[in-house]
């Protein structure tokens, strides 16, 4: 990747920052209730091959909106203003994001305080760490 050396962010050259990133194993949870940036963030995570996604498919909702208040201040609308285009020219909007490991949380387990997505993610990450340490 190209590095632009004359960019300074908060007193650091932009190219200095990637060497300070987290580079240990990681995993990300996603669920069917994710919306907007909660669709964009796991998409980038998967696209950059940072780690696995665990949970349920995320509907394609990655579009930025401008929040507009009408004359009646109780009426507020999000007007889509920015679409996020992929390298192939398609948009993230209406593009469902599938997890690497599909796990649903059922109402029966949630009311007991159990999170099967979190448990699956932790188990998978521990397996990855264990296999790296062999």
Language-model features: where?
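C-terminal "post-core" interaction segments
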Residues: 1, 5-134
């Amino acid at each position: 990747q190209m590095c632009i050396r004359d960019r300074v962010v908060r007193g650091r050259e932009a190219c200095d920052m990637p060497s300070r990133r987290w580079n240990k194993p990681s995993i990300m949870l996603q669920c069917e209730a994710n919306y907007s940036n909660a669709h964009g963030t796991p998409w980038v995570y998967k696209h950059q091959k940072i780690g696995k996604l665990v949970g349920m498919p995320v509907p394609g909702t990655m579009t930025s909106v401008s929040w507009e208040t009408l004359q009646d201040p109780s009426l507020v609308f999000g007007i889509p203003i920015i679409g996020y285009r992929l390298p192939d020219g398609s948009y993230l909007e209406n593009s469902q994001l599938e997890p690497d490991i599909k796990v649903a949380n059922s109402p029966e387990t949630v009311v007991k305080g159990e999170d099967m997505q979190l448990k699956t993610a932790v188990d998978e990450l521990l397996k990855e760490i264990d296999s790296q340490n062999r």
